[in-house]
Amino acid sequence: GPEAWLMIKAMESGSGSLSTTHAASAADAMDKLVTCCMEAGRHVSSELAARKLGRAIDLVVHIRLDNTIDVDGTRHRRRAVSEIVAVGQGEVDLGYALTTVFSPVPNAPASPTLLPDHLRVLAHHGFDIDTFHAQATGARR
């Protein structure tokens, strides 16, 4: 609800943050956050909320819940990363732009897709860019 607007204000401090919401996809999460921000009052338009979200959020990691049944009938619930999108400033009509970094694959972990240039700094923290590109290229074959 309206606490999403407060979340943006906290994120704008630039000290880093992590937040959760429930949605069917990463794009749906962004749409939901826009709607939640608008619940803060008439002063928050969808355009303002979308623009501020595009500046405040770097990544959306969507987690799915898989239900499986073993051959002996034992049921298991397992969470897996379904997709990761990079969020950036977008066109005037939407306010933010989404770039799919890891895309959904049915019954499998998300597959590497595209690494935006601004995320290359992750290499300084142990992210293997060469492996990412090799896997992304292999997934497209």
Give the location of each predicted region:
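Conserved P-loop NTPase nucleotide-binding/switch module
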Residues: 1-62, 71-77, 82-86
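Flexible loop residues that form catalytic
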Residues: 65
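NTP-binding/hydrolysis catalytic cores, primarily Walker-type P-loop NTPases
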Residues: 72-141
